[in-house]
Amino acid sequence: MLHGGDYNPDQWLDRPDILADDIKLMKLSHTNTFSVGIFAWSALEPEEGVYQFEWLDDIFERIHSIGGRVILATPSGARPAWLSQTYPEVLRVNASRVKQLHGGRHNHCLTSKVYREKTRHINRLLAERYGHHPALLMWHISNEYGGDCHCDLCQHAFREWLKSKYDNSLKTLNHAWWTPFWSHTFNDWSQIESPSPIGENGLHGLNLDWRRFVTDQTISFYENEIIPLKELTPDIPITTNFMADTPDLIPYQGLDYSKFAKHVDAISWDAYPVWHNDWESTADLAMKVGFINDLYRSLKQQPFLLMECTPSAVNWHNVNKAKRPGMNLLSSMQMIAHGSDSVLYFQYRKSRGSSEKLHGAVVDHDNSPKNRVFQEVAKVGETLERLSEVVGTKRPAQTAILYDWENHWALEDAQGFAKATKRYPQTLQQHYRTFWEHDIPVDVITKEQDFSPYKLLIVPMLYLISEDTVSRLKAFTADGGTLVMTYISGVVNEHDLTYTGGWHPDLQAIFGVEPLETDTLYPKDRNAVSYRSQIYEMKDYATVIDVKTASVEAVYQEDFYARTPAVTSHEYQQGKAYFIGARLEDQFQRDFYEGLITDLSLSPVFPVRHGKGVSVQARQDQDNDYIFVMNFTEEKQLVTFDQSVKDIMTGDILSGDLTMEKYEVRIVVNTH
């Protein structure tokens, strides 16, 4: 298990005493892996063509001397001032067509040949010098790729991308973007510009294609970065760190990670949940952490890496509250339980100046191993040292929820429904909740992944759906799968053009219904549905449904669609399809999905009886179940093991009742 984090010795080159202390503190903190060089370009190449690698040579040797490993970063995330000054084409241009000044980070032009050449060259030098060093574990490409550039170079690249996508046919493009609307038809490629608040931003097809282009151009930039690394170090794995947006930990929207995942050897991501906030319970937030972990793990169906987190507070939330005692261990073990093979922090040593000098770190400004945060990091390290056999183990699931970046983009761009209540990823989290509460493993997959391994596939709010996806959902259900779809699904195709002539005929065949209209409610509006003799509250969206051949499971109670279907079920060949026409309260989700859990014989990997707020997650290999029992409440909780298990940390055999303290985690193993 990797334990450590972002280490920036380049900030302390004038303090050899600090660098010496770092090595001592690494051993005391039970850390073993360090991401080095992420923003070090100015230290590596202070002037164009003048290189200073000696300090990095020394760091490699120091870390190697204690048995540590280095995740070596390429430095493109922040460039030296001389590079911006000498080659202004590398500066990003924003959507309002304003060229940015030098400064900040993550703000280069994605297309600039100069910047691509410069990054490829410095990367080659790093690979030549450190590619065969025994401490080198992995390449960390740039840092948190994101954002877009609207300069002339990028406009040209975008037009070339469009020519390729639309077979050099403006007629095809004009149809796909529905440009006759507002007389926006293009008759020359040079007329096309990227979306802009001072230009075109109302063509949804253009907006969607721009986002696709930015993803492809970012991947192209990344692929340029790794050319020398693949050539010189073909056996060293490569990653780049993905992100999620707080406070709800929704997948980062700047890039389609489902595409990017195909180009990395391992998924890694930076997790910064707002623990101990004042608007939700610890368990509610833990559920959201579980969801995003299961999405990023499922991208490659293999363990991922937690590349960044904080051992205590961050510096960029609205309120930067410290992790309470025990929370760093609990939150770290949750990451491991959901598939991570690492706990890596930002930052190892707290910066003395600039914007992140107050961001949490393993080593604080006091330079002491005696403070609470350092001691809790050391405890995480001691725990991880006992979990080496968990590395590489999987989390097999029979249930999947489908998340789609392009659908998210299109739905957010749609000028309809209600902007504040679309909440696509939060809706997926609501459907995920019942399975998390029942400790049932879930894969959060994308539309291109294989549906066949699953008994149950849940597809909420799939507003954008292609013919290919419809066909694959049809095959999944016909072959015996159980499919759940909701309101605001099947509205547009991959060009963000609406389907005409009613709901897609294959969707009508699968579900035995046709949605006729969607009623969008004001945030304070409420309705209700009756389901199995119980009344459940409904808000935000209600679909008026025409039943063809389906069975009615629930009906609306009020408004002009009172006594009409709200939830339906339909036998389709060997499978079954449910359509949920309204946004319903959490208790409906629990009751509905508990019925499917029973019908489909879905179960936890290893059953542990517990109360609300305790999560039990497991990883498996052929011989063992590694079970993480986690108390995400502020109270003591009773859990019960009906079978004997071995506590990995103590070696004790546990059975029957066990009282857990608040924020406590117990890790046990069940041998098959």
Swiss-Prot record:
An example Gene Ontology molecular-function term: beta-galactosidase activity
EC code(s) of this entry: 3.2.1.23
Temperature and activity: Optimum temperature is 50 degrees Celsius. Thermolabile above 50 degrees Celsius.
Gene Ontology biological process terms in this record: galactose metabolic process
Annotated catalysed reactions: Hydrolysis of terminal non-reducing beta-D-galactose residues in beta-D-galactosides
GO cellular component, one term: beta-galactosidase complex
Induction profile: Repressed by the transcriptional regulator GanR and induced by galactobiose. Also repressed by glucose.
Positions of Zn(2+) binding: 109, 149, 151, 154
Disruption phenotype: No chromogen 5-bromo-4-chloro-3-indolyl-beta-D-galactopyranoside (X-Gal) hydrolysis. Reduces beta-galactosidase activity observed with polygalacturonic acid, citrus and apple pectins, galactan and soy flour.
Alphabetical keyword list: Glycosidase, Hydrolase, Metal-binding, Zinc
Protein name according to UniProt: Beta-galactosidase GanA
